[in-house]
Regions:
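Glycine-rich beta-strand-to-loop/alpha-helix junction loops that act as flexible
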Residues: 130-131, 160-169, 197-200
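Solvent-exposed alpha-helices and their adjacent loops that cap or buttress functional pockets
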Residues: 27, 47-49, 75-79, 118-120, ...
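Short glycine/threonine-rich loop-to-helix capping motif typified by GTGT followed
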Residues: 4-6, 136-141, 169-179, 204-214, ...
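Glycine-rich and small/hydrophobic secondary-structure elements
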Residues: 179-186
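Charged (often Lys/Glu-rich) extended helix/loop segments that serve as interaction or gating elements
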Residues: 181, 192-336
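Short glycine/serine/threonine-biased micro-segments
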Residues: 82, 107, 123, 161-163, ...
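Active-site-proximal beta-alpha core segment in soluble small-molecule metabolic enzymes
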Residues: 1-159, 171-173, 181
């Protein structure tokens, strides 16, 4: 959300982007732009190079393909992003395979055996991303795996990007250990070190307001909402996970249990496992929490389900400001 960039600029040194579109948006942030993608296209690279500070490649083949473009840009304009490669530490503690970047055979990052005997001249950075919603103890063990598998590369590079997945804003996150890990690594290797807060920058933010439209009788009744799990919060079905609804408990915690049904025609557009102290009513509003990260960015216009307006709340003034409204033109123009 570029509308909150002024707030984010106070805390972040830049953005990590996946491809051209995110890089262009990151440029609007006004600070460092670091770009990584599983693969780049030449016509995209012409636009990425001028606006990027670091550029991480997913393979040696990609690095070698685009190294001449980087060299040419340096000669022509005096600027080229610092090139690095993404490696696979082959150390995984992520429990959900969908989000495990170090699973066996994963396409993300280069294994150490594929670097043996290779000419690594010109590679200035090492990038790894192995965490997902995890604490600093996992990073500590992952760093040890990187040091064990990639010592030659670590000696050579100027910077190391330790990727995302760090839940640094979670209340029980061990920030002191994170600081020790980063300081110890920098003192040992003498490199510039980066981490990507990612989700942590928006953890526990964003509320999705739903309204009960109908209630379908069944052994476990279904409340039909004016939102959709598959269109508005697909991560709840893909991961899957049970989102938090204010005032709702787990099954058996309260006397009235419901499923939450979405507005699409997908039979599985349903969320399970909610109980309430009182029966739900048609017209009643339900508030889903923690709906900003990995939710808004993955929304779809499937089935023409309308998108909710986006508003920003200022607690100092207790005012809401609507920054985006969606309508039929957005649905129509998405495809053709």
């Amino acid at each position: 959300m570029f509308s909150v960039f002024p707030i984010m600029r106070e805390y972040l040194s830049g953005c990590c982007a996946s491809g051209l579109n995110e890089a262009l948006l990151a440029q609007e942030f006004g600070k460092e732009v670091h770009v990584y993608a599983p693969a780049f296209k030449a016509h995209e690279m012409r636009d990425i190079i001028p606006i990027s500070h670091h550029l991480s490649f997913n393979s040696l083949a990609q690095f070698r393909k685009f190294k001449p473009m980087l060299d040419a840009a340096k000669v022509a304009s005096g600027h080229a992003p610092s090139p690095g490669i993404r490696v696979n530490p082959e150390h995984s503690e992520v429990e959900v395979s969908l989000y495990d970047p170090c699973s066996p055979g994963c396409r993300l990052g280069i294994r150490s055996d594929l670097l043996e005997g290779e000419d690594l001249t010109g590679i200035e950075g090492l990038h790894f991303h192995a965490l997902c919603e995890q604490d600093s103890d996992v990073l500590d063990r992952t760093v040890a795996a990187v040091e064990k598998r990639f010592p030659r590369l670590l000696e050579q590079v100027q910077w190391v990007n330790m990727g995302g997945g760090h839940h640094i804003t979670r209340k029980d996150y061990d920030v002191d250990l994170l600081i020790r890990v980063l300081r110890t690594f920098r003192e040992k290797w003498g490199k510039d070190v980066y981490i990507e807060p990612g989700e942590a920058a928006g953890l526990n933010t964003g509320y999705l307001i739903a309204e009960v439209q109908d209630i379908i009788a069944a052994p476990t009744p279904t409340a039909i909402l004016d939102i959709s799990a598959t269109a508005h919060m697909p991560d709840t079905l893909e991961m899957p996970y049970r989102p938090h609804i204010f005032g709702a408990g787990l099954p058996g915690e309260h006397p009235y249990e419901y499923k939450m049904g979405g507005m699409s025609c997908l039979a599985g557009d349903v969320l399970h496992g909610f109980s309430f102290p009182e029966p739900l009513r048609i017209g009643q509003r339900l508030v889903f929490a923690d709906m900003a990260h990995y939710t808004m960015v993955k929304t779809t216009t499937f089935n023409g389900v309308p998108h909710p307006d986006i508003a920003i709340y200022d607690p100092a003034t207790q005012e809401y400001r609507v920054v985006r409204k969606f309508g039929y033109p957005d649905f129509r123009n998405k495809l053709s």
